[in-house]
């Protein structure tokens, strides 16, 4: 296969697999490869798709070809290609072909088809070209990165996330619980971990559509939520007003760094740390500490790597199509950085299985509302979401990604915290 002229199906096979596998590959030149009776497969439909595969070998080239419609998946719904991705991950060895094999691919495709071409319009610019928006994790560049992902369409998010409009890991009280029950349970758990009582003050940074803001306000807590997404802030503030919670809560369109108020009884960060940048953790956690009164509590909820050695930067697909400038590290690094700013870490736990279940339900919602979603954001963007959520589900199931809660407190100079000796919340 690696010395003679290759068919297009064989080229597709090279870029996705090695050895025996349960997939069927077909291509626009009429060629086939793989297992004939396989229920799952990939179809390379155009020469442009071959160009994407050859000029960006690996996940980015595959994503470009898939999002553009030049590569089609069979046996799965585009809103939830989980079974295909799981099969590829578990039974196929993804690889970057050797230089010798790539040279043969070039000869087979033809030199005219290996010159770089424009990626799909859904793709963000590479990191080096984002300098026009400011330095990495500057306020202007962070705002643009958040806009790329979170300002897609509130209607679209309502279809995918469901009534809770909560775009973070749910906490399932049991395997049979619905997504809505699990999201409500997550807010309940965070509320209890933070020991909030009526009249207390909470700052929720990266508040999204205000789910935690409204939950806490319903229980009598005064809350400020801050989000960089204009669409989220508009939706969240309206939801606050519609529930009659304006006397207690507000959702601001604001960088968390622009919150001037201090002396909060608690700070929650639910899904923001992923956007901060690892090098900025000292400032970030120091800033959150500065917002707390002495004795106040911080709950940091974020996606992490499974170890503390892997690179913090996202892969090509995630960085270009999902979370531009997003960075992840291990829970050990998160805990260390929280301790380094002088906060005392009280408790930590991992919810990775819960995130896999959350993503399962989000994909189910996307499939259910597929026609509406495509009409709202277009087929390529809808496919990006199905691909990214299903791939993330596989990553959490395989322990490549985790979701951690870290609870910490701002002790007084003598080390007093006035906290119970044992955990005070219901699991």
Swiss-Prot record:
SUPFAM superfamilies named among the record's database cross-references: S-adenosyl-L-methionine-dependent methyltransferases (SSF53335)
Residues involved in S-adenosyl-L-methionine binding: 167-168, 202-210, 227-232
Species of the source: Mycobacterium tuberculosis (strain ATCC 25618 / H37Rv)
EC number: 2.1.1.-
CDD domains documented for this protein: AdoMet_MTases (cd02440)
UniProt-listed GO biological process terms: lipid biosynthetic process; methylation
Keyword set, alphabetical order: Lipid biosynthesis, Lipid metabolism, Methyltransferase, S-adenosyl-L-methionine, Transferase
Function text: May be a S-adenosylmethionine-dependent methyltransferase involved in fatty acid metabolism.
Gene3D superfamilies: Vaccinia Virus protein VP39
Signal peptide (UniProt feature, chain positions): none
Domain of life: Bacteria
One Gene Ontology cellular component annotation held by this UniProt entry: peptidoglycan-based cell wall
Top EC class, one word: transferase
Protein name per its UniProtKB record: Probable fatty acid methyltransferase Rv3720
Pfam families the record matches: CMAS
InterPro entries: CFA/CMAS, CMAS, SAM-dependent_MTases_sf
Single GO MF descriptor: cyclopropane-fatty-acyl-phospholipid synthase activity
Family assignment from sequence similarity: Belongs to the CFA/CMAS family.
């Amino acid at each position: 296969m690696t010395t003679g002229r290759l068919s297009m199906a064989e080229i597709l096979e090279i870029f996705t697999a090695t050895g025996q596998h349960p997939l069927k590959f077909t291509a626009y030149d009429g060629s086939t490869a793989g297992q004939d009776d396989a229920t799952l497969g990939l179809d390379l439909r155009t020469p442009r798709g071959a160009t994407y595969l050859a000029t960006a070998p690996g996940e980015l080239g595959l994503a470009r070809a898939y999002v553009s419609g030049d590569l089609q998946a069979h046996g799965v719904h585009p809103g939830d290609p989980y079974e295909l991705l799981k099969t590829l991950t578990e039974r196929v060895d993804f690889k970057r072909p050797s230089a010798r094999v790539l040279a043969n691919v070039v000869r087979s495709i033809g030199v005219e088809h290996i010159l770089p071409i424009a990626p799909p319009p859904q793709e963000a610019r590479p990191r080096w070209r984002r300098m026009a928006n400011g330095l990495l994790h500057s306020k202007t560049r962070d705002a643009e990165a958040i806009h790329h992902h979170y300002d897609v369409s509130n209607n679209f998010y309502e279809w995918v996330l469901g009534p809770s409009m909560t775009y973070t890991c749910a906490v399932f009280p049991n395997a049979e619980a619905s997504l809505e029950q699990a999201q409500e349970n997550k807010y309940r758990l965070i509320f209890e971990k933070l020991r909030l009582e009526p009249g207390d003050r909470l700052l929720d940074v990266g508040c999204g559509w205000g789910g935690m803001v409204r939950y806490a306000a319903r229980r009598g807590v005064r809350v400020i939520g801050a989000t960089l997404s204009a669409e989220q802030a508009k939706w969240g503030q309206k939801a606050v007003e519609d529930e009659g919670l304006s006397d207690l809560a507000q959702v601001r369109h604001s960088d968390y760094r622009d919150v001037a108020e201090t002396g909060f009884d608690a700070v929650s960060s639910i899904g923001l740390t992923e956007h901060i940048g690892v090098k900025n953790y000292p400032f970030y956690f120091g800033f959150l500490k500065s917002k707390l009164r002495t004795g106040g509590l911080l709950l940091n909820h974020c996606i992490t790597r499974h170890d503390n050695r892997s690179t913090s930067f996202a892969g090509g697909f995630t960085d270009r199509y999902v979370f531009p400038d997003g960075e992840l590290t291990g829970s050990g690094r998160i805990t260390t950085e929280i301790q380094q700013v002088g906060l005392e870490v009280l408790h930590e736990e991992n919810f990775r299985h819960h995130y896999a279940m959350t993503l399962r339900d989000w994909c189910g919602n996307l499939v259910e509302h597929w026609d509406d979603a495509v009409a709202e954001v277009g087929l390529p963007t809808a496919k990006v979401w199905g691909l990214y959520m299903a791939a993330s589900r596989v990553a959490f199931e395989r322990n490549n990604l985790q979701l951690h809660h870290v609870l910490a407190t701002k002790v007084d100079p003598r080390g007093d915290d006035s906290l119970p000796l044992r955990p005070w919340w219901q699991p």
